[in-house]
């Protein structure tokens, strides 16, 4: 009887853990979609760029959620800034930087 109870407890603990991870991933998808849509709308880019930026921002949110180190978060922010700069023309990157609220949100 004790073994059955222990198995049930482990099963429910595993189920709750899995549910929490799925919920966190859904939140990351929502944040990445919002950032990519806002950047694409501001810079008047196409669907391919939106997909590319979604993947970039999802990577950013996923990596930031895995760490609590401020130093690591700064490294991630620098990576995102460099990838944005490499992906965009100089004019479009400057336009994004001028919109400081959006720029700070997408790199931090």
Regions flagged by a language model, labelled:
Residues 21-108:
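Charge-rich (acidic/polar
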């Amino acid at each position: 009887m004790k073994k059955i109870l222990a198995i049930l407890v482990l099963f429910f603990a595993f189920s709750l853990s899995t549910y929490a991870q799925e919920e966190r991933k859904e939140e990351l998808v929502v944040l990445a979609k919002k950032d990519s849509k806002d950047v694409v709308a501001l810079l008047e880019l196409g669907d391919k760029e939106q997909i590319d930026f979604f993947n970039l921002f999802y990577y950013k949110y996923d990596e930031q959620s895995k760490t609590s180190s401020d130093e690591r978060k700064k490294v991630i922010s620098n990576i995102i800034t460099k990838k944005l700069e490499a992906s965009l023309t100089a004019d479009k990157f400057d336009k994004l930087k001028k919109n400081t609220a959006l720029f700070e949100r997408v790199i931090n």
